[in-house]
């Protein structure tokens, strides 16, 4: 029996010829990432155990994205702690408050490549599976072990394959696809399984759209999300590495044709419509027309799910087409990274957002984490392009968050209420 792409990557990383689901392996780590929230916990754990040197300062990426600039004395103290650690350890790849969200910055700086094992002290590290890597989130204590040894144990996960075929309808995006999948599978339906996305629809998707898919694998319990690499992937990775001086050899790994999957879902893309993930669970997915008409207070366009140039283009196109946003709606726009921000500036997108009264923030986690920007008050309703709508995620426990695509979110900003973008 053949192996899936995830099984092959873990076999290679652990020095084995083959592995099977359920096997325990000790894998060599290619890239380890922490940010300003999880990094201090990792550093303090290293100190507690008397570890004075990291295993490889060139394989560690440290980045500030959650509380940037520092929004409290505690946040500032954490930044100071991490900057000191970077200097003491000679960490080569450190991105201070200026660069953006970790899950956008890592691939665009060339830190993720096909066939690699990438771990991050953040649950949405699964995003990087869009590049054919085994990427997963881990805790800060496990990360301390990685910093010290360069290794981590894994139980080889089973793989669920999502075969997505057909053409997406107008106003439907990969965000609608992944929300529809989560609505079908459930928030725990893929617990500790690798969620592999494939089929002709995925092949046609841009890298940005693929990242939206893998980003949300964790929202159905997935150990990782992954897409087998193709020419699009290889071109993106090579260009990013060349641009930022992070070139290194990598191996393009694909699964065997006779690999065995735990489950296979057949997804007909042409039947997917614009949807919302309604409060207060990501799998509470309803077609947009089912819940249309509910007044809203805020729209957030950004995050590691949908803050890329492609997303900003889609959103401003809707807003511009319909002459602006509703008077009673606040719109917070946060580009995912400085590079994406600069591209949007060059295209005039940022100017247009400002023209129509949107608030454009620095690249960061922004309103997604209920800190710094766009905190919701009691009873307020927000349409967000982010990945979680749990109670209290963006502020008050009494607020409501509806997850949607950038197109649908922008349409809601125009209308001032929940709406199917096809009905504007």
Curated annotation (Swiss-Prot):
Q: Which reaction does it catalyse?
A: (2R,3S)-3-isopropylmalate = (2S)-2-isopropylmalate; (3R)-citramalate = 2-methylmaleate + H2O; 2-methylmaleate + H2O = (2R,3S)-3-methylmalate; (R)-malate = maleate + H2O
Give the enzyme's EC designation.
Answer: 4.2.1.33, 4.2.1.35, 4.2.1.31
What cofactor is this protein dependent on?
Answer: [4Fe-4S] cluster
Show the SUPFAM superfamilies listed in the entry: Aconitase iron-sulfur domain (SSF53732)
> Origin, by domain of life?
Archaea
Provide the GO biological process annotations: isoleucine biosynthetic process; L-leucine biosynthetic process
Which PROSITE patterns did the record assign?
A: ACONITASE_1, ACONITASE_2
Activity over temperature: Optimum temperature is 70 degrees Celsius.
Q: Name one GO molecular function term.
A: maleate hydratase activity
Task: Kindly state what the record says about how the cofactor is bound.
Answer: Binds 1 [4Fe-4S] cluster per subunit.
What InterPro entries does the annotation carry? Acnase/IPM_dHydase_lsu_aba_1/3, Acoase/IPM_deHydtase_lsu_aba, Aconitase_4Fe-4S_BS, Aconitase_4Fe-4S_dom, HAcnase/IPMdehydase_lsu_prok, Homoacnase/IPMdehydase_lsu, IPM_dehydratase_rel_enz, IPMI_cat
EC top class, as a word:
lyase
| Record carries keyword Nuclease | no
Biological pathway: Amino-acid biosynthesis; L-leucine biosynthesis; L-leucine from 3-methyl-2-oxobutanoate: step 2/4; Amino-acid biosynthesis; L-isoleucine biosynthesis; 2-oxobutanoate from pyruvate: step 2/3
Please tell me where [4Fe-4S] cluster binds in this chain: 304, 365, 368
Record key words, sorted? 4Fe-4S, Amino-acid biosynthesis, Branched-chain amino acid biosynthesis, Iron, Iron-sulfur, Isoleucine biosynthesis, Leucine biosynthesis, Lyase, Metal-binding
- Kindly report the pH dependence of this protein's activity: Optimum pH is 7.5.
| Job of this protein | Enzyme with broad specificity that catalyzes reversible hydroxyacid isomerizations via dehydration/hydration reactions. Catalyzes the isomerization between 2-isopropylmalate and 3-isopropylmalate, via the formation of 2-isopropylmaleate, a step involved in leucine biosynthesis. Catalyzes the isomerization between 2-methylmalate and 3-methylmalate, via the formation of 2-methylmaleate (citraconate), a step involved in isoleucine biosynthesis. Also displays malease activity, i.e. catalyzes the hydration of maleate to form (R)-malate.
Query: Belongs to which family?
Result: Belongs to the aconitase/IPM isomerase family. LeuC type 2 subfamily.
Subunit structure, as described in the record: Heterotetramer of 2 LeuC and 2 LeuD. Cannot form a complex with HacB.
Q: What's the protein name?
A: Isopropylmalate/citramalate isomerase large subunit
Tell me the name of the encoding gene: leuC
């Amino acid at each position: 029996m053949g192996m899936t792409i995830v099984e092959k990557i873990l076999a290679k990383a652990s020095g084995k010829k083959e592995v099977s689901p359920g096997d325990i392996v000790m894998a060599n780590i290619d890239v380890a990432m922490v940010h300003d929230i999880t990094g201090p916990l990792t550093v303090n754990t290293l100190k507690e155990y008397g570890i004075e040197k990291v295993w490889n300062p060139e394989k560690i990426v440290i980045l500030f994205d959650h509380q940037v600039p520092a929004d409290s004395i505690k946040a500032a103290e954490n930044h100071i702690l991490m900057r000191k650690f970077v200097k003491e350890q000679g960490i080569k790849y450190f991105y201070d408050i200026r660069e953006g969200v970790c899950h956008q910055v890592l691939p665009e700086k060339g830190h993720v490549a096909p066939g690699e094992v990438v771990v991050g002290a953040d649950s949405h590290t699964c995003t990087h599976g869009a590049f054919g890597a085994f990427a997963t989130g881990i805790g800060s204590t496990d990360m301390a072990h990685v910093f010290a040894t360069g290794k981590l144990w894994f139980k080889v996960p089973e793989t669920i394959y999502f075969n997505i075929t057909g053409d997406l309808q107008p106003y439907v995006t990969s965000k609608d696809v992944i929300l529809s999948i989560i609505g079908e599978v459930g928030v725990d339906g893929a617990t500790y399984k690798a969620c592999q996305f494939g089929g002709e629809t995925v092949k046609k998707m841009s890298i940005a759209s693929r990242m939206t898919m893998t980003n949300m694998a964790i929202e159905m319990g997935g150990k990782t999300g992954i897409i087998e690499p193709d020419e699009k992937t290889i071109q993106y990775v090579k260009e990013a590495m060349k641009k930022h001086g992070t070139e290194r050899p990598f191996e393009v790994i694909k699964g065997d044709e006779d690999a065995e999957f735990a489950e296979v879902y057949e997804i007909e893309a042409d039947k997917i419509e614009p949807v919302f993930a309604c409060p207060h669970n990501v799998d509470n997915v309803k077609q947009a027309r089912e819940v249309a008409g509910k007044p809203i207070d805020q729209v957030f366009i950004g995050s590691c799910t949908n803050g890329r140039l492609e997303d900003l283009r889609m959103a401003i196109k809707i807003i511009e087409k319909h002459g602006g946003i509703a008077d009673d709606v606040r719109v917070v726009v946060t580009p995912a990274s400085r590079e994406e921000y600069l591209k949007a500036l060059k295209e005039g997108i940022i100017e247009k957002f400002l023209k129509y009264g949107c608030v454009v923030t620095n690249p960061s986690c922004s309103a997604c984490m209920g800190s710094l920007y766009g905190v919701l008050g009691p009873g307020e309703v927000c349409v967000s392009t982010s990945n979680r709508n749990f109670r209290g995620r963006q502020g008050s426990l009494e607020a409501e968050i509806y997850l949607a695509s950038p197109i649908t979110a922008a349409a809601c900003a125009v209308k001032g209420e929940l709406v199917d973008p096809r009905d504007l």
